[in-house]
Amino acid sequence: FEAMVHDLRMLLRLADGRTPHPSAAILDSRTLQSTPTSGGRAGYDGAKRRKGSKVHAAVDTLGHLLTLHVTPASEQDRDQVGQLAEAIQEASNQEVTLAYVDQGYTGQRAAEAALEHGITLEVVKLPEAKRGFVLLPRRWVVERSFGWAARFRRLARDYERLPKTLAGLHYLAFVCLMLPHISDAMSIV
């Protein structure tokens, strides 16, 4: 499914008048609450006050999945930057040079891990005078992608025994999400 997501992402980018490989990515993570089946590998996310698994994802600027990595929820976001950056460059043919991230990816180690793979991290911060909900530039794209994935029942919680199964289901969900857009793009051409 990973190869299908890669091919569909390239086709959708070309249909949108963009280059086949993105030059920027957006990184974020979301915590999925564990179930008794997945409980053995679950960790506790203190920020979300939830026990489960954390899905670290990278999407392009259109919201299409580049790569993802599943860890226990107790893992810090900044510790996953190196692995995500390597997978991003593999998926994008070494063309991504900039990644938009939230406050969870701050720190010298995270920036150095990304730079080892040729990616500069740009932290998108909340405005000083924040009142209520604020739409952050660039960051809303990855949140929308998580919203798309959460519509699939198997991805609303972590029901899986193995992390690679959970990752595979995310790739499958994005294939299902991209296919209708491909048919729309092909009917225009």
Question: Which positions does each model-derived feature cover?
Answer:
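Short alpha-helical elements
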Residues: F1-V189
